């Protein structure tokens, strides 16, 4: 399984311009206005995997998860992006960052998280500012799991269905176990 470790997945995002461009596209921002800062420290010693700047203001704080996680680590990631939203709402920054009004807290992970687990990502509470991104580790396509997809997943509460991560963007496929 590629990108099992969070550090390897972070390295991929930090080094791949196409992934960075796709993230900018999901966030509806121009790549030329983009700057990515890795392992940025916020209050209480919280270290964000990435801070994404647009015109020198914080546009997003990104939490990465490696491919070898289970439900507990996924929920921990949700907690982290809730905290990032709190930083935005209260203008909390050790470095006196300004925040964009269209700020997003981002949770990003490889497709293996959905393929290899039985939990339903539609049955969690997420912050209002959230963007959930899945990166296909084979073709490096970035997919935004939007509110419509989360709603479809919420409707399949029973365990007879599982999400299969797509090989292309903007597809959500279910299969019966």
Regions found by a protein language model. Give the residues of each.
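Charged, terminal alpha-helix-loop-beta segments
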Residues: 1-177
């Amino acid at each position: 399984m590629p990108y099992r470790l969070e550090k390897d997945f972070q390295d991929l995002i930090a080094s791949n311009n196409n992934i960075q461009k796709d993230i900018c596209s999901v966030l509806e921002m121009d790549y030329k206005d983009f700057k990515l800062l890795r392992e940025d420290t916020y209050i209480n010693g919280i270290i964000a995997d990435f801070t994404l700047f647009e015109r020198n203001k914080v546009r997003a704080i990104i939490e990465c998860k490696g491919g070898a996680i289970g439900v507990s680590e996924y929920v921990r990631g949700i907690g982290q992006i809730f905290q990032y939203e709190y930083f935005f709402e209260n203008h909390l920054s050790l470095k006196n960052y300004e925040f964009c009004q269209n700020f997003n807290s981002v949770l990003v992970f490889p497709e293996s998280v959905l393929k290899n687990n039985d939990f339903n990502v539609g049955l969690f509470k997420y912050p209002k500012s959230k963007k959930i991104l899945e990166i296909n580790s084979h073709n490096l396509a970035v997919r935004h799991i939007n509110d419509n997809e989360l709603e479809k997943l919420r409707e399949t509460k029973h365990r007879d269905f599982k999400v299969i991560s797509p090989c292309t963007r903007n597809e959500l496929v279910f299969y019966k176990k």
